[in-house]
């Protein structure tokens, strides 16, 4: 938790592990039809696109078979795998890691994290001349899937056809709904400030912070009262509560990398797609600019307009965005009892995550560490 490190992966499976083994024929058809549509919409002939997707699907299935089971992705013991650059080069003999890191703008990659080693090894076996066409297909599909909803109506229709075929839900939206979603996704920093100005107050922020402090105090009392925990483990648990970060409503700073995005109007030669790319580039450059800095634990991983809350084990903090601090869960003008019965149970729930089967594997600084005694 004291430094930022790079994470690395190769091509992977686009769907969950069970899909490739037990998925219904209709769902598989919806998925492969979608991939084929992406390739034909980008200029390939129908027959060539179908052949490429068939080979790609088989590769995905092989990688999926070697990957972690779904429940293991929340197990830090299985996903926190650090490699030196030399170790990773040995694992990936056909990948020029130095060139990849340089092209990505990553510097000083002394340690690199791999979340799914099995999937990486299976994918690495495909990185040779014999699979060059497959790798080109994978790269093309990865790019198209990442931008499909920012392209023309044909790509949008292909996506909604996939959702209908896979989930049985017609998710087609009006242009207004699509525009609202794009604003939320691309201009989240600006929308967050506008939302807070309209729907949240400093008074509410202070009130909820006080409530959280009361809950943390009660947790400490109850931990100290347990007869099954050793004094050593109790002390560390209390320390984790004492250092737990509390984020309520909105961040203290509204600085945004969006300020540096080169947005151009149609009159200036810009388009919706070019502006999407400009925003994504600004976000990427912001990440790269801070890659050698210590993690900024004041940064938020949720937007203030998100109706949710979370505990982040790698920062040891809890976050309650302004949007969840609304009626009926919370009202600054309601009684304390009403608010305790609403947002109170969510506060208690999020604090508990610090000691669940995943959170308990991180210490007060957010570092993966076994701080429990063997007996406890």
Task: Give residue spans per PLM region.
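Noncatalytic, helix-rich "gating/capping" subdomain that lines the substrate-entry/channel surface
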Residues: 1-214
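Intrinsically disordered, low-complexity linker/terminal regions across diverse proteins
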Residues: 91-94, 106, 113, 117, ...
């Amino acid at each position: 938790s004291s430094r930022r490190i790079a994470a690395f992966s190769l091509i992977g499976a686009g769907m969950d592990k069970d899909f490739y083994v037990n998925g219904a024929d209709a769902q598989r058809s919806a998925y492969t039809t979608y991939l084929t549509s992406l390739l034909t919409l980008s200029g390939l002939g129908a027959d060539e696109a179908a052949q490429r997707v068939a080979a790609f699907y088989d590769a995905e299935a092989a990688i999926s078979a070697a990957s972690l089971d779904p429940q293991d992705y929340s197990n830090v013991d299985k996903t926190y795998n650090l490699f030196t650059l030399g170790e990773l080069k040995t694992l990936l003999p056909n990948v020029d890691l130095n060139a990849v890191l340089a092209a990505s703008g990553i510097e000083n990659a002394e340690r690199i994290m791999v979340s799914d080693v099995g999937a990486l090894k299976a994918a690495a076996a495909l990185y040779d001349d014999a699979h060059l066409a497959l790798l080109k297909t994978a790269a093309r599909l990865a790019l198209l899937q990442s931008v499909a909803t920012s392209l023309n109506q044909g790509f949008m229709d292909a996506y909604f056809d996939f959702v209908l075929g896979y989930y049985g839900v017609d998710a087609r939206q009006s242009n207004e709904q699509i525009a609202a979603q794009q604003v939320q996704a691309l201009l989240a920093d600006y929308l967050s400030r506008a939302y807070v100005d309209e729907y949240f107050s400093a008074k509410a922020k202070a009130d909820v912070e006080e409530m959280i402090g009361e809950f943390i105090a009660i947790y400490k009392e109850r931990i100290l009262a347990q007869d099954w925990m050793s004094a050593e483990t109790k002390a560390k648990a209390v320390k984790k509560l004492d250092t737990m970060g509390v984020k309520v409503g909105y961040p203290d700073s509204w600085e945004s990398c969006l300020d540096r995005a080169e947005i151009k109007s149609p009159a200036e030669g810009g388009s919706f797609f070019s502006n999407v790319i400009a925003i994504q580039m600004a976000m990427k450059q912001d990440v790269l600019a801070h890659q050698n800095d210590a993690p900024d634990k004041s940064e938020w991983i949720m937007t203030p307009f998100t109706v949710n809350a979370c505990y982040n084990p790698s920062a040891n903090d809890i976050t309650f965005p302004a949007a969840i601090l609304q009626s009926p869960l919370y009202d600054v003008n309601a009684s304390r009892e009403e608010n305790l019965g609403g947002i109170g149970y969510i506060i208690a729930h999020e604090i508990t995550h610090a000691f669940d089967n995943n959170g308990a594997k991180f210490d007060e600084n957010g570092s993966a560490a076994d701080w429990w005694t063997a007996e406890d």
